[in-house]
């Protein structure tokens, strides 16, 4: 018995330090590649491609200013360098320079040579417009992208569904997400579809799927949270509270303080909000913001805190 326990501890420790080592090696490799590209550029190989490659590595390290400078150099050398223009658009949007980002995205559309390239550029502009607070304009471009490329991509469906929510057309979200799931087979889209069913109060469709997952899944917290929302929506408050408390215990076991999964923190915050622990939910939201979680992760929790806190 002791040998088995020792072996498990040894394996866990090995995997843990291997993960830490891989992270360190990854950053070391990125810095080494930046060094190589810098030598090439300084020795006369100051091509658009080398500046673009170095910009990508700077972005990986979170050195956005350096990445932006290199992208400018790449575009000075090749004004039609689409990949560099796309990256520049994203950086400008992230910095809140929306007018410049929109102009940059429009140039990507103009330079597109194929329907596939043009549809992808349309999605880029839709993302910028959403960030700029113009969802009604953004959805025109995401709709056009699907007309040009009906199969789309996973992130296109997620973006379009989010835009539908922003323009208060929630009831259309399940259909687009279900179409995306059927087209791509993506589990991400399947789960987003189920979430949209719950949010749109289509409980009779959502609950059997959730119950099946609870029977078959080893990790159950996200499914218990979904079922709790259904129970709340159908007035089964005691059953919802039981699910939420069980869900919270599982999440607390699965969240590692040194390297927490952002989506698990968001789920835990949502559970606390639904249990009425608003201050604790706010702490999880603040933690997510501090560690740089994207808006799609924080938005549902923020919405729940505002909604429940105002009741």
PLM regions: where:
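N-terminal leader/linker segments that initiate helical-solenoid repeat arrays
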Residues: 18-65, 69, 310
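Canonical positions in the second alpha-helix
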Residues: 40, 73-74, 107-111, 145, ...
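Structural marker of alpha-solenoid helical repeat scaffolds
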Residues: 43, 77, 111-114, 148, ...
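Residue-level recognition of tetratricopeptide repeat
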Residues: 47, 81, 115-118, 152-153, ...
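Canonical tetratricopeptide repeat
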Residues: 53, 87, 120-124, 158-159, ...
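Register position in tetratricopeptide repeats
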Residues: 60, 94-95, 131-132, 166-167, ...
């Amino acid at each position: 018995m002791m040998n088995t326990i020792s072996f498990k501890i040894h394996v866990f420790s090995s995997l843990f330090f291997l993960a830490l080592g891989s992270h360190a090696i990854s950053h070391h490799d990125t810095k080494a590649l930046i060094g190589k590209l810098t030598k090439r550029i300084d020795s006369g190989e100051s091509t658009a491609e080398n500046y673009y490659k170095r910009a990508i590595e700077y972005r990986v390290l979170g050195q956005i200013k350096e990445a932006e400078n290199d992208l400018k150099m790449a575009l000075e050398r090749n004004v039609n360098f689409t990949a560099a223009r796309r990256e520049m658009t994203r950086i400008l949007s992230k910095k809140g320079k929306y007018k410049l980002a929109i102009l940059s995205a429009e140039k990507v559309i103009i330079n597109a040579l194929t329907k596939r390239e043009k549809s992808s550029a349309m999605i880029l502009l839709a993302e910028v417009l959403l960030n700029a607070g113009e969802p009604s304009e953004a959805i025109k471009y995401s709709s056009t992208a699907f007309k040009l490329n009906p199969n789309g991509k996973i992130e296109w469906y997620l973006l379009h569904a989010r835009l539908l929510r922003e323009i208060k057309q929630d009831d259309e979200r399940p259909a687009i997400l279900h179409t995306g799931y059927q087209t791509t087979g993506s589990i991400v889209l399947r789960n987003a579809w189920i979430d949209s069913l719950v949010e749109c109060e289509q409980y009779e469709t959502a609950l059997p799927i959730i119950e099946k997952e609870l029977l078959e899944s080893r990790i159950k917290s996200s499914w218990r949270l979904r079922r709790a929302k259904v129970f709340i929506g159908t007035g089964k408050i005691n059953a919802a509270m039981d699910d939420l408390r069980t869900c919270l215990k599982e999440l607390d076991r699965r969240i590692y303080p040194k390297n927490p999964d952002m989506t698990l923190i968001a789920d835990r915050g949502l559970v606390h909000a639904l249990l009425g622990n608003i201050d604790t939910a706010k702490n999880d939201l603040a933690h997510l913001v501090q560690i740089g979680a994207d808006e799609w992760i924080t938005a549902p929790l923020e919405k729940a805190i505002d909604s429940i806190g105002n009741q």
